[in-house]
């Protein structure tokens, strides 16, 4: 009765241990489901990347559409240039036809102008003489009238001022008036002499006109010779424009054909992109469905397997492992040979020119076909883990990890990426800037062996030139939290097994038919995992086709750039020829403009001088008349002031007598007191002071007015003398300039006509130059846009390559994580079965001691 107690204790402890192991298994299953969810999240991220790539393609299409619009703009500019060339040709023919007519017309106009100028000069001289005589007669009569009126006024003043004390001032004024009359007589006499001098100058002006006619004939002959020399240059320019027109037409035809081809290629690429989108969606759905079915099959197998069936599975696995080991050895040899060949080919591929891009694409397709064979064996490992022993060397494990990184089944093989990296080795290094966040949490679950030291990880390089960063190496090498938890549970299991072991009361068994059905399901699941997806292969083919089209598009862009350079060279030649012609025309126009400007300046100066003289003469006359009127007014004001003073004196005398009589008539009462008398005296004294100050002020004011009037009269006399002198000088200058002005008028008219013709030709040439400059600027802008579009396309291409490499590494990591979890679950099931079948506690301890693991790669092969 005492024995059941101790025996039941180990039984309970073993049952607890088994329950703990079952809990651990359930936790592993939950971790596996969590990793599946994370893998689905990665799939969603990949889908987002795919949509981003689709948006990039749309942007590229927009860039291509903009280039097409620019090409249409260039075509319109070409048509405008052709129209301008035709206009230039028509202008040249019209100028040749109308040149002689213009010369004849100029000669005829010149003769008519000379005759009209001679007639005008004669008429103006006659009119000027007649007007001058009339003016002299009028001035004589005016001065006679003025003299008579002055004499009358002087007599009147003498009569008025005979009573006063200012007789001396009146005599002085009379003397001054007589002097003024004498000065006016002296002015009239020289003007008669000047009329005779003007007649002499008129004859001299006629002689000058004849000399100018001879000089005009010489200038016209020189102009005709210059026109003949310009005609040859114009013919050469027209010939050059014809050749340029033919070349530009050919270029336009070529550009039109190439644009049609580019549009066709763009439409094909759009269709292929849509097809690729649908195929990728289908492939994604199929992959998820296969993963779901695989997990369901694995769960069913875990439920029904027994220890005997597990042993049979182990035997089958050993056979499969031997076959896999043989295949791996063969593949390693093949990879070594391929690496040696690639090392030999690297300098050759780096020296390839851009014309060999199509050959590189064909090599990519061959390498794709050669590397697809390694996909099936690695995909089959999802269900049956690889059976490499623990004793394989570090080098073998490194090569195995490298081979696993090279395998792919969805985004293209590593060979295509390698060829791309060799062709574009200057861009592939940007992939090394990826950080750990780009790979997600699945990177930490990769089953890289601890035997991979830092040097081996640092030397690990993807075939496409993809380098892992230090952070990524640490993330791959480090243990995930799930792995740490698993290791801790296993260590706790081994340390806690100290009690005796009693085999469980019973375990689950299956029949032979069920076992055969399970074997068939396992075989079918392995075939499903090993079978390659048709959607993925179609996707790879479409991706290769897109790459070929991309290379063709680059070739077309290069051809278009070459044609654009040729067009720019031709445009530069045309601009040089045009610049030379413009320089010649500009030089001739500058010479003629200098001559015209000099003559115009002379004519303007003469006209301005004539106008100034006429204005000065008229102003002098007006000033003299105004001064005479002012003198008359001042004299009248003085006489009025004398009359007013006389009246004031009379009125003051009358007012004084009136006030005296009024004061006498008033009853004046003397004050009685001394104070009142004193106040009255003070008041009268103040009144007397005020009256005296007022009288002094009036006296000073009258004296000041008299002095001011005297000074004003003297100033007016001086101003009158100065005006007479200036008028005399201006009359002489006017006589000198009249002859020169009449001769310059005809010359000015002729120069204006020539200036108008030259300005019209200059405007036409400047318009042509502006149109050609606009064409050049538009072509330069088109070239800049094409180069920018090319750079953006290349940048997008390399970004897509980097994305593909990153997604490939994520896919490889997720596949390895799934394999490791399957391996771990199978190992735990085997260990549980072995514990159930163990006969003693020593056997259980030995089994648990074998399960002290720190890494997933240390699990024994089942």
Swiss-Prot record:
Residues recorded as bearing Phosphoserine in the entry: 374, 377, 407, 410
Keyword Nucleotide-binding among UniProt keywords: no
UniProt-listed InterPro entries: Rabaptin, Rabaptin_coiled-coil, Rabaptin_Rab5-bd_dom
Post-translational modification remark: Proteolytic cleavage by caspases in apoptotic cells causes loss of endosome fusion activity.
Modified residues (N-acetylalanine): 2
Chain positions with N6-acetyllysine modification: 282
Record's GO cellular component terms: cytosol; early endosome; early endosome membrane; endocytic vesicle; endosome; glutamatergic synapse; intracellular membrane-bounded organelle; protein-containing complex
GO MF annotation, one: protein domain specific binding
Compartment(s): Cytoplasm; Early endosome; Recycling endosome; Cytoplasmic vesicle
Coiled coil: 11-345, 534-816
GO biological process, one term: endocytosis
Effect of residue 441 to D/E: Reduces the interaction with AP1G2, GGA1, GGA2
Residues bearing the modification Phosphothreonine: 408
Effect of residue 820 to K: Strongly decreases RAB5A binding affinity
Chain positions covered by the region annotation Disordered: 315-338
PANTHER family: RAB GTPASE-BINDING EFFECTOR PROTEIN, RAB GTPASE-BINDING EFFECTOR PROTEIN 1
Subunit structure: Homodimer when bound to RAB5A. Heterodimer with RABGEF1. The heterodimer binds RAB4A and RAB5A that have been activated by GTP-binding. Interacts with TSC2. Interacts with GGA1 (via GAE domain), GGA2 (via GAE domain) and GGA3 (via GAE domain). Interacts with AP1G1 (via GAE domain). Interacts with AP1G2 (via GAE domain). Interacts with ECPAS. Interacts with KCNH1. Interacts with PKD1 (via C-terminal domain) and GGA1; the interactions recruit PKD1:PKD2 complex to GGA1 and ARL3 at trans-Golgi network.
Family under the similarity heading: Belongs to the rabaptin family.
Protein's name in the database: Rab GTPase-binding effector protein 1
Organism: Homo sapiens
